[in-house]
Design a protein with these regions (language model features):
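Amphipathic alpha-helical interaction surfaces
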Residues: 73-77, 94, 116, 136-143
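Short amphipathic alpha-helix initiation/capping segments at coil-to-helix junctions
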Residues: 60, 102-110, 122-130, 144-148, ...
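Basic- and aromatic-enriched surface patches that contact anionic nucleotides/nucleic acids
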Residues: 1-85, 89, 145-149, 153-160, ...
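Small-residue-rich helix-loop
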Residues: 80-120, 129
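Generic detector of solvent-exposed, compositionally biased contiguous segments
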Residues: 33-44, 50-53, 101-123
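C-terminal hydrophobic structural anchor segments
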Residues: 118-165
Length: 194
């Protein structure tokens, strides 16, 4: 499969260049790929990201990739080596044929996490911040679902004040192993206080 991805990647030189998730969509067919497309059009995802279905349809699989990143970093952060494309390819390959139960667990985790995230008054639109916050919430979902918006917003302010979310930390090299791990782990720790 890695070779197939490389072939698509190399052939992809004329016209509109395909984004990596567009290539993954072609190669890693299965119910996980279908789930990503469904979740990108779900009311929870649309509301949390201030999107319409029409906007998702024209986003060239950007939303599906963001959801893939959520699952990949949530479940396999320890396998991330700093090479995002191959990490996401591996996660899709290894999860392309989910059982119905696992598929439902994935959908439920994202939906529950988004509902808590929607309590945040001024949630960042930065995909790296949003992703870390969502994973931090997911890691503590049972406790956070019982908290009010005031607690969720206080915890989010703590995230914003953390050095891993400073303007300097979010300037460059956002996909480096150290920065990804630091952001996500900081969000998990902060939201665990809830």
């Amino acid at each position: 499969m890695q070779y197939l991805f490389q072939i698509f990647y190399r052939l992809n030189s004329g016209g509109n260049k395909l984004y990596n998730q567009e290539i993954r969509n072609c190669i890693f067919q299965g119910n996980f790929n279908t789930l990503l497309k469904d979740l990108a059009r779900s009311p929870d995802w649309l509301n949390a990201n201030h999107l319409t279905k029409e906007k998702v349809e024209t986003s060239r699989f950007n939303n599906e990739e963001r959801i893939l990143r959520f699952f990949a970093f949530y479940y396999d952060l320890d396998r991330y080596k700093g090479k995002l494309a191959s990490f996401l390819n591996d996660f899709m390959r290894n999860h392309k044929d989910l059982t119905e139960n696992v598929k439902n667990e994935y959908a439920s985790l994202l939906s529950r996490s988004l509902k808590v995230a929607m309590e945040i008054e001024k949630l960042s639109t930065s995909k790296n911040v949003f992703e870390a916050v969502l994973i931090g919430i997911a890691a503590n979902i049972s406790a956070l679902e019982t908290k009010g918006a005031d607690v969720i917003n206080k915890l989010y302010k703590d995230v914003e004040g953390d050095k891993n979310f400073s303007e300097e930390a979010l300037k460059e090299g956002l996909g480096s192993l150290e920065k990804v791990q630091n952001r996500i782990n900081a969000a998990k720790i902060i939201f665990a206080r809830g």
